[in-house]
A protein has these predicted regions:
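Short hydrophobic beta-strand element within catalytic cores of glycosyltransferases
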Residues: 35, 293-295
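Acidic donor-binding loop of glycosyltransferase active sites
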Residues: 250, 265-279, 292-293
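Short His-centered aromatic/hydrophobic patch
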Residues: 86-92, 113
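Active-site donor-binding acidic/aromatic loop of nucleotide-activated sugar
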Residues: 230-235, 248-257, 263
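A conserved, positively charged/aromatic
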Residues: 76, 100-137, 141, 148
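Glycosyltransferase donor-sugar binding loop
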Residues: 36-41, 195, 220-236
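A conserved mid-protein helix/loop that constitutes part of the nucleotide-sugar donor-binding site
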Residues: 16-21, 190, 194-213, 233
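A short helix/loop element that forms part of the nucleotide-sugar donor recognition site in Leloir-type
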Residues: 167-185, 238-239
């Protein structure tokens, strides 16, 4: 069986990590796996298990990206997928129009709702699928309330994590040496961690404010996660807040990391402080699988 997954980019993130995990599992079962995206740091992980990657500029919501409909159709004609799995709204629109004029046998379309999507019309593309996956009961209920979907085609499949990667095995001395060389300010401190991409609803301000009430001689906070180009102003405002509170020596932004499992293990507590309900907080189960306290 041939399966293609479609998403904007393969950078650090829960959706992206899930895409890699599924691709790896498909390959392990003997299926032919491929991913279409605008690339990113996780593409190399596809190579490790023999999956294909088709680079297509579908990350930005603009007319130029819509011009990729024909190119996507050509990829389908070449790869001949049995299943196309769409994981994001804009790529789902491109997929919808690409399949309309695809000659021959059309693939089964599966979509995964990874969030409580606003803009119902724009998000409607995710409902244009033969089978739909909701990653939690919250998301499942939201789909029923906002979209016209047949219940028999809507499947509740909770997200999980790879227990081969997220486990209680001890950290290697080599990794610890590299970590403390890069972040010496974290050594011999109670390490508090707020993982996730830099965005306003992740509770980063609350995490920063927490340090007003802590003995900073004992505690250090780290925030591992990528900063998108359109979030640079928000990121700058966070850095300003930290500076105003004289916390620059006690809070560290780590950027996008490929060693997040090790970061969970070196942490004393991993936080999830999202200011609105998360569809599914993947960082919580990942950290718990590593034996780290979660708050």
């Amino acid at each position: 069986m041939k399966v293609i997954q479609l998403l904007p980019e393969l950078k650090i993130g829960g959706v992206e990590r899930g895409t890699i995990d599924l691709s790896q599992h498909l390959s392990k079962l003997g299926h032919e796996s491929a991913v279409i995206s605008n690339g990113g740091s996780l593409v190399s992980l596809l190579d490790q298990h023999g999956a294909k990657h088709f680079n297509l500029p579908i990350a930005k919501k603009n007319l130029k990206a819509l011009s990729q409909i024909k190119n996507l159709r050509n990829i389908y004609a070449e790869f001949q997928p049995d299943i196309v799995h769409v994981r994001s709204r804009f790529p789902a629109w491109i997929n919808y129009y690409a399949l309309r004029k695809l000659k021959g046998k059309k693939p089964i379309v599966v979509s995964t709702f990874h969030g409580l999507y606003s803009k119902p019309f724009y998000s409607k593309s995710m409902s244009y699928a033969d089978e739909i996956i909701a990653i939690s009961k919250t998301v499942q209920n939201y789909i029923h309330q906002n979209y016209t979907v047949d219940s028999k085609n809507l499947h509740l499949i909770y997200r999980g994590c790879d227990l081969e990667e997220f486990n209680i095995n001890p950290l290697s001395d080599a990794w610890k040496d590299l970590w403390y060389k890069e972040f010496p300010q974290t050594k011999d401190k109670i390490l508090l961690t707020l993982p996730g991409r830099i965005t306003s609803w992740k509770g980063i301000e609350a995490f920063i404010n927490l340090f007003d009430h802590l003995d900073t001689a004992k505690f250090h906070g780290i925030i591992p996660g990528p900063v998108a180009q359109n979030k640079m102003n928000y990121f700058a405002s966070l850095e300003k807040l930290i500076k105003e509170k004289n916390l620059s020596d006690h809070l560290t932004f780590c950027g996008a990391r490929s060693d997040i499992a090790e970061i969970y293990k070196v942490s004393d507590i991993v936080f999830n402080l999202s200011s609105k309900p998360e569809p599914f907080g993947r960082t919580i189960i990942e950290a718990a699988a590593c034996g780290t306290h979660v708050m």
